[in-house]
Amino acid sequence: MEAIWLYQFRLIVIGDSTVGKSCLIRRFTEGRFAQVSDPTVGVDFFSRLVEIEPGKRIKLQIWDTAGQERFRSITRAYYRNSVGGLLLFDITNRRSFQNVHEWLEETKVHVQPYQIVFVLVGHKCDLDTQRQVTRHEAEKLAAAYGMKYIETSARDAINVEKAFTDLTRDIYELVKRGEITIQEGWEGVKSGFVPNVVHSSEEVIKSERRCLC
């Protein structure tokens, strides 16, 4: 029987507090925008299936992390078991962009010996008139770290699907090439799920009769 999903990828969404991590995830997983969103305390969990090719689905397990310093010791524990991540900054908040380097360095320390595929996300692009970070400098920073760059808006649903699906496809290609593998004790990538098939007693009897012929 065909698998419900081919692989499960665990993703983590990181960045400073108030950059809009929870809003972006809820727009992607629930299709809605929350005008008022309470700060994440520790870590929240979401999931969604994504079809990357016809008939090929990936289950995304998405961890929404708190950006406040007092919760960092909790969120660091989730780095190691993630295979991919969105690193968010707010295009209207230059400080959140300047802190991208710090987030990447922290992740690098705690993810060993595994790797995380990141996409850099400039969020709140609907507020372009208040922009404090140019697209050019964001693209330059992303290139320096070997990341893709994309600008999104949870409020206006701009590039939200693309951010998650592009990241998923990048990870999938690495898995297909054998550069990322399923490993015991690591939750980043898991193999697909095939549901158990319960046969009726009549079907079992017919099968047994065929075997006796």
UniProtKB/Swiss-Prot annotation:
UniProt modified residues of type Phosphoserine: 201
List of residues binding GTP: 17, 20-23, 37, 40, 67, 123-124, 126, 154-155
Binding site for Mg(2+): 22, 40, 64
Location of the region described as Switch-II in the Swiss-Prot/TrEMBL record: 67-83
Chain's role: The small GTPases Rab are key regulators of intracellular membrane trafficking, from the formation of transport vesicles to their fusion with membranes. Rabs cycle between an inactive GDP-bound form and an active GTP-bound form that is able to recruit to membranes different sets of downstream effectors directly responsible for vesicle formation, movement, tethering and fusion. RAB39B is involved in autophagy and may function in autophagosome formation.
UniProt GO MF annotations: G protein activity; GTP binding; myosin V binding
Tissue: Specifically expressed in neuron and neuronal precursors in the brain. Expression is high in all regions of the brain with highest levels observed in the hippocampus.
Lipid anchor positions (S-geranylgeranyl cysteine): 211, 213
Family: Belongs to the small GTPase superfamily. Rab family.
GO CC term (a single one): cytoplasmic vesicle membrane
Species for this entry: Mus musculus
Membrane topology: Lipid-anchor
Keywords: Autophagy, Cell membrane, Cytoplasmic vesicle, Golgi apparatus, GTP-binding, Hydrolase, Lipoprotein, Lysosome, Magnesium, Membrane, Metal-binding, Methylation, Nucleotide-binding, Phosphoprotein, Prenylation, Protein transport, Transport
Record's subunit section: Interacts (GDP-bound) with C9orf72; C9orf72 in complex with SMCR8 acts as a GEF for RAB39B. Interacts (in GTP-bound form) with PICK1 (via PDZ domain); a PICK1 homodimer may allow simultaneous association of RAB39B and GRIA2 to PICK1 which is involved in GRIA2 trafficking. Interacts with isoform c of RASSF1; the interaction is strong. Interacts with isoform a of RASSF1; the interaction is weak. Interacts with the DLG4/PSD-95. Interacts (GTP-bound) with HOPS complex components VPS39 and VPS41.
Domain free text: Switch I, switch II and the interswitch regions are characteristic of Rab GTPases and mediate the interactions with Rab downstream effectors. The switch regions undergo conformational changes upon nucleotide binding which drive interaction with specific sets of effector proteins, with most effectors only binding to GTP-bound Rab.
Name this polypeptide is given: Ras-related protein Rab-39B
